[in-house]
């Protein structure tokens, strides 16, 4: 049990330290990062001019969501190949040391529900209503469409990955598939909510921006911790959920950015 507490504490410290590192540094100052982001921005702006904001958002979302699945798929196959060396020892250790009737087990059982599909859907509906009210003058329908797309694309993307990766079952009750849907949903929902906050109040300071996404990362870590602790997933299913959730969140952010003011289109030559 002490090791379980230690793992939780170390995870918290790592996530917070990563957030602090992002805050004190400016990764986008790197030349190659600025160049890459600049190219993506120009592609987005041209797409908005050619397809309109809604059309560009759909095109970006479809392209980047497909990329998220394509990237996460071989990672899952790799995890499947090395399951005996990676997941097996972790699962056996957890089964030997976890107390299925203690207070800590009950706490984990309650907390892990934050990543369940129904709870995520309820939170998404509440967030959609709130942001729709805040976006009345900008287009009240935009936040609900963004949040709804996040939920739908996660559901079908996760289902597709579960089929093509086809991780072997354990025979344990309630054991999930690759990638962990709870972890992916936690990243996608709260990451999308955070990005909508930034779109709604664009003058928010960098400190609060970094702090907000650090909280999202902490929620995702806690969800993954509970899924492993409660023996609901292979450990690498959780890592896959974080990966897929992050990539799909980037797709949602890319699509949502099409509704931001864009630069003037380059003049024809």
Language model regions located:
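N-terminal transmembrane-helix/juxtamembrane module of multi-pass inner/ER membrane proteins
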Residues: 1-119, 162-170
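Hydrophobic, lipid-facing residues on alpha-helical transmembrane segments of integral membrane proteins
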Residues: 17, 63-66, 70, 145-160, ...
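Hydrophobic, membrane-inserted alpha-helices
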Residues: 44-45, 104-109, 124-131, 219-224
């Amino acid at each position: 049990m002490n090791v379980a507490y230690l793992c939780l504490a170390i995870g918290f410290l790592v996530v917070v330290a990563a957030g602090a590192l992002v805050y004190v540094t400016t990764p986008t100052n790197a030349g190659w990062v600025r160049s890459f982001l600049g190219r993506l921005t120009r592609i987005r702006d041209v797409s908005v001019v050619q397809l309109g904001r809604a059309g560009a958002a759909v095109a970006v979302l479809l392209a980047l969501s497909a990329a998220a699945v394509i990237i996460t798929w071989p990672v899952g196959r790799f995890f499947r190949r090395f399951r005996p060396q990676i997941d097996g020892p972790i699962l056996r250790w957890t089964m030997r040391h976890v107390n299925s009737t203690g207070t800590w087990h009950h706490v984990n059982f309650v907390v892990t529900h934050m990543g369940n599909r129904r709870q995520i859907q309820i939170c998404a509906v509440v967030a959609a209503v709130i942001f729709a009210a805040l976006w009345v003058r900008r287009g009240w329908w935009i936040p609900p469409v963004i949040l709804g797309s996040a939920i739908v694309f996660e559901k079908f993307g996760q289902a597709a990955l579960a089929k093509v990766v086809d991780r072997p079952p354990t025979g344990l009750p309630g054991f999930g598939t690759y990638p962990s849907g709870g972890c992916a949903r936690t990243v996608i929902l709260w990451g999308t909510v955070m990005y909508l906050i930034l779109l709604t109040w664009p003058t928010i300071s960098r400190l609060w921006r970094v702090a907000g996404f650090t909280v999202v990362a902490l929620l995702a870590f806690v969800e993954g911790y509970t899924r492993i602790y409660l023996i609901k997933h292979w450990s690498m299913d959780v890592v896959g959920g974080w990966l897929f959730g992050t990539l799909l969140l980037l797709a949602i952010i890319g699509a949502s950015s099409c509704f931001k003011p864009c630069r003037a289109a380059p003049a024809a030559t």
